[in-house]
């Protein structure tokens, strides 16, 4: 097996091949003279040809593909020989053909010696020769010093043969094979020895003027690139892969090109001929086929993404609204010129320009006819005279615009306002506008079903509680009320009841429907297809993952993109892989956003409407009672009964302590669920206030299990460490939660980098709550602050919440407080009208009527909690999964957490 050749050997072999071809050209040039001289001149030449013919006709010689060689002109305008080394090494020279001293491919594998460095003057001399020694052919080195050889050498003829020829007629198109001719094959085998680029090809190019500069259109040439880099005004465009220069460097470039023997440039005036070392041949017309597409970049303009073409540039310059962006190097036009541009581009044979998608042209049909400079379409103000006056008068200006937008879209839209902008109240108002088409179906995450119930009762006084049906188990009736509220999970279990169509449907956290393969999506999509009004709510539309938006888009407007593949190609950067199509990417996001906002989507950020928002937005969140375990409910009932008995004042306080602690135990699963849902919804930084240690412990345990960064400040935190923990929170990035004690961290600390505060528990002193709220509502806060109070029915919250409101009202009348919970908080009147409620409320009020008793009660509460850690509260320290599994009468053995984003959507910020 032959050893691989070194780079030097390959180079010398290539030189030898060129020289052998030169000798053959010399021999062929002598043949016509021999034929003209007749038999008188046929002496040695005739004998040589006879020897060659005898050799070619001899059948006993071994024949391999090494015996095939091509007669070709030595023009540098064509690629050098690209045959494999084995073939080139075994090609016979003219001397070898006449003497018969040439070898087949197998023999030549050992007949090619390693070349020694040649002197500089020997570049045009044969490298390999053969001499006979003792009857055997041997490879010898011939430096050209002697004139020995079968043919006399003519230096002038060799130089002429070595010069590149520009005539195509001198090129032979035949292969000579042993025994005769065979037609030339189409392809040429690759040159496996040519590992480095060689500038042996002749390049032709042209200079093209573009404004005050000119660019050079030509192929790659190493020497030419060096010339380009020597010019000070050079600039390389990586997109078009061309060089351009200032006109001041034009003459210098042309002079430098004249010194290059393998490059020809057509001057700018196109009349001076080619500039270069060779005479230029007429170049064939360019057959470059360019393709491009149109993309929407604003409500009034579109952009063209296409490769360079002089014809296309000429077409662009015919458009009156043309505009060229120097940064992106793209042209844009008004929408009203879209159809004209597409029509004229079809007249260009080598250009294919794809128009805007049909969905886009339909959505912007008015702009295509006559482009309006307005950045937003005019939305007529809706007539809301048929909606409850309390609701209409409470709407902020931007919320009123949202309702009008929905009605202008005939009640089918995706409301994607930022968190905290009141999507719930807007959705209720939109649904109330179509009240004649009720019953209404509201599909929401399970933990906020009762929050929606309270919102309907608050904003629609004309709606009686009996007309609201909250489905809590899989056995409930989905059509029992005028307003039917159900969770996503229960909707899947009630598919049999969905035969009765709902004309008006609200889907809260509609991004739950991102995957068509999920059970909740399969259950919801048929409802949305037959519904007349579809109101989707989502605080964080997945604009970066367009594939997750597709289900929501077709739910609102089924005719938008009937086929997902077309949507995926345009907006998901679809790629075909060996196992199928990949739609996980994104493309043309700007166009998609403009399209959705024009047709179905309304999205406002807090920064857009900050001037209309109050400094604080309070929201009372009614947690899911299904999360409270039966054991906790029994303990609460027992504690409530104890409070109604005749007791001394000290015994009453002890009963209150028991009730207060049982409430903390019962709310643990609800609080943990809410915190995790906030994190999954995209909330990154917020505060969680609680009084009982068991709640802080439970939340901290879940955060650690989820690997969520958090800090904790309670009564056991040293004073020196509190400020350090605060700074850690302020400077942190990403998801961070601050777990804070209501009494230990309600003053002296600043958490202005957060704009959300969650109170896991209520406190009987509203002044302490307001101080805790102000940890984020401080100097340096640039956003509207959201305050969420988590309350649970059937617990101490039933009595603490009205007590807090009463105290705030008294302080406000005395001018000691500017806060009004009743007017600034959603869903305040949630409390059950229980006969024993008045007695318990009075007991709370009597116990806390004097603020001086607060500290005594706090100390007693803390002592009670510490003393009960080995008893009752031992039940709390059990695995949280046991507390969270009991839900809706059907306890599956898995986590029942719902993951959704925009808890602020349930509030009406007033």
Swiss-Prot record:
Task: Just give the chief location class.
Answer: nucleus
Instruction: Kindly give the PROSITE patterns that the UniProt entry links to this protein.
Output: HARP, HELICASE_ATP_BIND_1, HELICASE_CTER
- Stretches of Basic and acidic residues bias are at 7-29
Which residues are recorded as modified (N-acetylserine)? 2
Domain (Helicase ATP-binding): residue spans on this chain: 404-559
Q: Which reaction does it catalyse?
A: ATP + H2O = ADP + phosphate + H(+)
Tell me which residues bear Phosphoserine: 118, 165
Coiled-coil region(s): 3-34
Q: How is it modified after translation?
A: DNA damage-regulated phosphorylation by kinases that may include ATM, ATR and PRKDC.
GO CC, one annotated term: site of double-strand break
Kindly give the SMART domains that the UniProt entry links to this protein: DEXDc, HELICc
Output the CDD domains linked to this UniProt entry. DEXHc_HARP_SMARCAL1, SF2_C_SNF
InterPro entries reported in the protein's UniProt record? HARP_dom, Helicase_ATP-bd, Helicase_C-like, P-loop_NTPase, SNF2-like_sf, SNF2/RAD54-like_C, SNF2_N
Instruction: Write out the GO MF terms.
Output: ATP binding; ATP-dependent activity, acting on DNA; ATP-dependent DNA/DNA annealing activity; helicase activity; hydrolase activity
What does the subunit section of this Swiss-Prot or TrEMBL entry state? Interacts with RPA2; the interaction is direct and mediates the recruitment by the RPA complex of SMARCAL1 to sites of DNA damage.
Q: What is this protein called?
A: SWI/SNF-related matrix-associated actin-dependent regulator of chromatin subfamily A-like protein 1
Query: Can you name the source organism?
Result: Mus musculus
Its lineage opens with: Eukaryota, Metazoa, Chordata, Craniata, Vertebrata
GN (gene name)? Smarcal1
């Amino acid at each position: 097996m032959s050893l691989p050749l070194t780079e030097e050997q390959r180079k010398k072999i290539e030189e030898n091949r060129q020289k052998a071809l030169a000798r053959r050209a010399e021999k062929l040039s002598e043949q016509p003279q021999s034929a003209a001289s007749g038999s008188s001149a046929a002496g040695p030449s005739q004998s040589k040809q006879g020897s060659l013919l005898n050799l070619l006709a001899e059948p006993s010689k071994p024949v391999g593909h090494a015996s095939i060689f091509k007669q070709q002109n030595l023009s540098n305008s064509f690629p050098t020989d690209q045959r494999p080394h084995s073939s080139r090494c075994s090609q016979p020279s003219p001397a070898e053909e006449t003497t018969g001293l040439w070898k087949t491919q197998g023999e030549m594998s050992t007949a090619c010696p390693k070349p020694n460095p040649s002197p500089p003057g020997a570049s045009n001399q044969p490298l390999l020769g053969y001499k006979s020694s003792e009857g055997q052919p041997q490879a010898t080195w011939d430096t050209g010093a002697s004139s020995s050889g079968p043919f006399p050498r003519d230096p002038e003829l060799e130089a002429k043969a070595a010069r590149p020829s520009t005539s195509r007629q001198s090129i032979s198109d035949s292969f000579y094979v042993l025994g005769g001719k065979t037609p030339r094959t189409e392809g040429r085998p690759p040159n496996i020895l040519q590992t480095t680029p060689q500038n042996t090809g002749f390049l032709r190019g042209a200079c093209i003027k573009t404004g005050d500069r000119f660019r050079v259109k030509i192929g790659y040439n190493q020497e030419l690139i060096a010339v380009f880099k020597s010019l000070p005004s050079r600039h390389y465009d990586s997109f078009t892969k061309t060089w351009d220069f200032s006109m001041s460097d034009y003459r210098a470039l042309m002079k430098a090109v004249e010194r290059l023997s393998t490059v020809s440039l057509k001057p700018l005036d196109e009349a001076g001929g080619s500039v270069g070392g060779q005479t230029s041949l007429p170049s064939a017309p360019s057959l470059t086929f360019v393709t491009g597409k149109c993309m929407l970049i604003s409500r009034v303009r579109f952009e063209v993404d296409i490769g360079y073409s002089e014809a296309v540039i000429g077409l662009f310059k015919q458009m009156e609204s043309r505009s060229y962006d120097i940064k992106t190097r793209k042209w844009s036009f008004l929408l009203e010129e879209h159809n004209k541009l597409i029509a004229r581009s079809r007249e260009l044979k080598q250009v294919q320009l794809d128009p805007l998608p049909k969905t886009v042209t339909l959505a912007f049909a008015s702009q295509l006819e006559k482009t309006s400079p307005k950045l937003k379409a005019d939305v007529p103000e809706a007539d809301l005279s048929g909606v409850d006056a309390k609701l209409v008068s409470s709407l902020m200006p931007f919320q009123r615009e949202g309702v009008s937008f929905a009605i202008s879209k005939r009640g089918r839209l995706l409301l994607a306002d930022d968190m905290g902008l009141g999507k719930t109240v807007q959705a209720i108002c939109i649904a109330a506008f179509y009240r004649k088409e009720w019953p209404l179906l509201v599909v929401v995450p399970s933990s906020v079903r009762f929050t929606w119930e309270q919102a309907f009762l608050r904003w629609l006084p004309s709606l009686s509680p009996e007309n609201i049906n909250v489905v809590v188990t899989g056995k409930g009736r989905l059509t029992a009320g005028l307003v039917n509220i159900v969770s996503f999970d229960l909707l899947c279990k009630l598919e049999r009841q969905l035969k009765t169509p709902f004309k008006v449907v609200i889907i809260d956290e509609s991004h739950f429907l991102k995957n068509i393969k999920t059970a909740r999506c399969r259950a919801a999509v048929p409802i949305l297809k037959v519904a007349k009004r579809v109101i989707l709510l989502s605080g964080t539309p997945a604009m970066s993952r367009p594939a997750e938006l597709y289900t929501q888009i077709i739910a609102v407007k089924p005719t938008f993109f009937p086929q997902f593949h077309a949507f995926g190609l345009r907006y998901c950067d679809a790629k075909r892989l060996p196992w199928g199509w990949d739609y996980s990417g994104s493309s043309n996001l700007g166009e998609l956003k403009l399209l959705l906002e024009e047709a179905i989507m309304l999205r406002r950020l807090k920064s857009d409407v900050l001037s209309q928002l109050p400094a604080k937005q309070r929201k009372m969140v009614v947690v899911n009672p299904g999360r409270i375990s039966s054991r906790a409910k029994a303990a609460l009932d027992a504690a409530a009964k104890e409070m109604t008995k005749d007791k001394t004042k000290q015994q009453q306080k002890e009963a209150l302590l028991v009730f207060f602690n049982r409430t903390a135990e019962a709310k643990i699963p609800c609080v943990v669920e809410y915190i995790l849902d906030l994190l999954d919804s995209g909330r990154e930084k917020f505060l969680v206030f609680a009084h009982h240690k068991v709640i802080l412990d439970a939340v901290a345990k879940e955060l650690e299990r989820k690997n969520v960064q958090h800090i904790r400040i309670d009564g056991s935190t040293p004073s020196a460490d509190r400020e350090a923990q605060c700074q850690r929170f302020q400077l942190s990035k990403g998801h961070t939660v601050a777990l804070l004690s209501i009494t230990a961290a309600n003053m002296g600390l600043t958490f202005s980098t957060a704009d959300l505060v969650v109170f896991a528990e209520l406190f009987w002193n509203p002044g302490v709550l307001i101080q805790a709220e102000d940890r984020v509502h401080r100097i340096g806060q640039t956003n509207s602050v959201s305050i969420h109070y988590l309350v649970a029915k059937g617990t101490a919250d039933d009595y603490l919440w009205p007590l807090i409101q009463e105290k705030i009202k008294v302080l406000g009348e005395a001018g000691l407080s500017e806060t009004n919970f009743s007017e600034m908080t959603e869903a305040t009147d949630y409390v059950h009208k229980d006969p024993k409620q008045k007695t318990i409320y009075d007991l709370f009020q009597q116990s806390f009527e004097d603020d001086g008793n607060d500290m005594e009660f706090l100390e007693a509460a803390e002592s009670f909690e510490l003393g009960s850690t080995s008893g009752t509260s031992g039940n709390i320290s059990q695995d949280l999964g046991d507390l969270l599994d009991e839900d809706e009468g059907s306890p599956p053995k898995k986590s029942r957490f719902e993951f959704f984003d925009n808890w602020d959507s349930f509030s009406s910020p007033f």
